[in-house]
From Swiss-Prot:
Main location (coarse class): plastid
Protein name: Small ribosomal subunit protein uS4c
Coiled-coil blocks: none
Organism: Coffea arabica (Arabian coffee)
GO cellular component labels: chloroplast; small ribosomal subunit
Length: 201
């Protein structure tokens, strides 16, 4: 299954706010209307919708998300927590959380077009897994800096997660540590996602 490229508002109307996909928010009352229209949800549908929220927020294909679930399942600790850590430490998501890109698709474009350096080297793989002490910078070119500046100017002035530090005038971000679960950028029940995949195998 390919990455979703359809109408974004349609997805947030059904699944709720997906800040990584779009900075638009569903209108108040939409959730209630959807529940009334669809009646009582089955457990399968609840798990499916949590999985879809995760997939669309982080901009993943079905195959990519399944791969992350399998990696998380083999790691020490809670599979759900490890899964969220893996997704949050992707380069495209780090750029989004720093405010250097307005959405995760926009961050992916920055990376694909070689505007981003990690530790002084161009990285053009959006799924690159960032590590503590990584230094992320915009390329020292006018176009790269202009794209990042536009996002910095328009990004909401929210508290930065504790695992990141931003130096906006240097177009630079630092990864201080692995993300703490309380700073995950999406309201999600990750256990339902793990359950969804465990029942598919």
């Amino acid at each position: 299954m390919s990455r979703y490229r359809g109408p974004r508002f349609k997805k947030i109307r059904r699944l709720g706010a997906l800040p990584g996909l779009t900075n638009k928010k569903p209108r108040a009352g939409n959730d209630l209307r959807n529940q009334l229209r669809s009646g009582k949800k089955s457990q399968y549908r609840i798990r499916l919708e949590e999985k879809q929220k995760l997939r669309f927020h982080y901009g993943l294909t079905e195959r990519q998300l399944l791969k992350y679930v399998r990696i998380a399942g083999k790691a020490k600790g809670s599979t759900g927590q490890v899964l969220l850590q893996l997704l949050e430490m992707r380069l495209d998501n780090i750029l989004f959380r720093l405010g250097m890109a307005s959405t995760i698709p926009a961050a992916r474009q920055l990376v694909n077009h070689r505007h981003i350096l990690v530790n002084g080297r161009i990285v053009d793989i959006p799924s690159y897994r960032c590590k503590p002490r990584d230094i992320i910078t915009g390329k020292d070119e006018q176009k790269s800096r202009a794209l990042i500046q536009k996002s910095l100017d328009s990004s909401p002035q929210e508290e930065l997660p504790s695992h990141l530090t931003l130096h906006p005038f240097q177009y630079k971000g630092l990864v201080n540590q692995i993300i703490d679960s309380k700073w995950v950028g999406l309201k999600i029940n990750e256990l339902l996602v793990v359950e969804y995949y465990s029942r598919q195998t």
